Amino acid sequence: MIALLLNSGRGTRMGAETKEHPKCMCRLDDQDTIISWQVKLLRRVGVKEAVVTTGPFADMLREHLESLNAGITFHYVPNPDYMNTNYIVSMDNARALLEADDVISLHGDLVLAPEVMDMLAAAPVSSVAVDASLPLPEKDFKARLTGGRVSAIGVNVFGEECVASQPAYRFLRKDFCRWMEEIRRFVERGERTCYAENAFNAAWEEIPLYPLDVGGRLCAEIDNPEDQARVCAQFLRTVRSKA
């Protein structure tokens, strides 16, 4: 199993902090950044190789990851056009490194409880984190469920059949390769600023993806300072206090 860590975004909604480092290097507490915590969880489930997409501050991120001495081999894939494209292009750039194994894919601003990573790694089918205990968020991903499978993921996906979702994925190799094929089609025809999930939505019937309900456990993105305060407080209360 290989990890895909998406870190090519600018993180402008974080304000002044991301003018000095990538968003994934925002601190959760005095022990961990977002990405150092992700790396610890990946090692926890036996991942030994990770593809890291980069945008601004690529050298700083590389230095940070290598300083962790995590026992993971990192492959860095830059997106030179990160200012004008979305991570659909970053994923397309990395496709050659992601064809041979099952994939755990995380957005670089995602904070997870250890149990959520354990659930992802153990999932026998391609899965995405959802939380049916939460109200549907306005600004974050929702997943539409059809016949027990995920049929659409997006910010503007609403309805009674939808649940709150986060971009934490476990993909079987064949399913991930099919998604990447559709991503390639999108990029080739110039759809370079949309979410990669748009490509999944276009081919969902051929990509069996199932909801993995995290049941209220921490699984949340940090998009802005308000998110950071809330998620860090939850991290300290529900994760760090148990360590």
Where are these regions (language model features)?
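Conserved alpha/beta core of the MobA/IspD/sugar-nucleotide pyrophosphorylase nucleotidyltransferase superfamily
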Residues: 1-3, 164-243
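N-terminal nucleotide-binding beta1-loop-alpha1 segment
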Residues: 1-19
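Conserved N-terminal catalytic core of the sugar/cofactor nucleotidyltransferase
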Residues: 2-5, 32-101
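Phosphate- and divalent-cation-binding pockets in alpha/beta enzyme and binding domains
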Residues: 13, 60-63, 115, 221, ...
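Short catalytic helix/loop segments, enriched in acidic residues and glycine
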Residues: 20-36
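A structural signal for short hydrophobic beta-strand segments in well-ordered beta-sheet cores
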Residues: 25, 143-145, 211
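Conserved beta-loop-beta/alpha segment of the NTase-like Rossmann-fold superfamily
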Residues: 69-141
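Conserved core of the sugar-phosphate nucleotidyltransferase
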Residues: 113-190
